[in-house]
Amino acid sequence: MIDAFIEVLKTFPIGLVYVGMGILLLAFARLVQDFVTPYKIQEQLRTHDNVALALSIAGYYLGIIIVFVGAVYQPFTSSVDSNLGFTTEYWGDVIEVLVTTVIGIIILNVARIIVDKLVLYKFSTEKEIVEDHNAGTGAVEAAVYVSVGIV
């Protein structure tokens, strides 16, 4: 029992790096989405209680989490050394996860624009979500984000 606990403690710092990176990447994704959307997301959520936008953003964050977990999930090799497991191979994996997730964030934002212009071209998704608070359109955007995150 104690041996298993000690083994967990040996790999704990390795996992902690991924947790911290995940939190920072979600904050980065929020900044990117604020930059690419023409409306103020926090204002829409706080003052207008926009459920449609809340659905869309939930799908956006879920899509990012799917990309991140997909990038992190790989065969785990426990090569613990004197540096608490922080080997050169480990840092290469961390950089790979970081780059993959940043590319995923960019692709998710481009996918929203493509769906707005090519798939849902008969109406403005921005107008439907921001002005009309159309929860159906918010759900469609959420589904697009999750689908792109899975791919």
PLM region descriptions:
Residues 7-25, 92-107:
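Alpha-helical transmembrane segments
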Residues 32-36, 68-83, 114, 118:
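Membrane-helix interface motif
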Residues 111-126:
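Transmembrane alpha-helical segments of integral membrane proteins
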Residues 97, 101-114, 140, 147-148:
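Mid-bilayer segments of alpha-helical transmembrane spans in multi-pass integral membrane proteins
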Residues 51-75, 143-148:
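A generic, lipid-embedded transmembrane alpha helix
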Residues 1, 76-91:
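Membrane-interfacial helical/loop segments at transmembrane boundaries in membrane proteins
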Residues 27-47:
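Membrane-interface helix-loop junction between the first two transmembrane segments
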Residues 42-56, 125-141:
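Membrane-interface segments at loop-to-transmembrane junctions
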